[in-house]
Amino acid sequence: MTNKNFYNALKAEKERLMNESKQASRDCQIKHGEMSKAWNIINALESLDKFGTQELSNAYDNYEEASHASMLADNYLDDIDEAIDKINELMSLYTD
């Protein structure tokens, strides 16, 4: 593979990752919203003195699940951004 072909392959992969990053960012926003909603339900149940109920227990389980999903979405977005940074570093070798 020639240097020009390699550079073009890097450029194409960067473009693909940039599009993936946009979707991952939207997914993060959705997951953060789900986590916030789950926490608001917990607050509402606690304000109604629903302590020790199955309903509150389920709400905490839902929050834990939403929190985990949010963390995974954040990690995925971070991984994409890191890959883009590495591609930018490689591409800079060809422009210097």
Where are these regions (language model features)?
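Glycine-centered signal
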Residues: 9-10, 42, 82-85
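Short, charge/polar-rich alpha-helical segments
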Residues: 1-33, 69
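Amphipathic alpha-helical coiled-coil segments
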Residues: 20-27, 51-95
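Extended alpha-helical coiled-coil "stalk/arm" regions
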Residues: 27-59
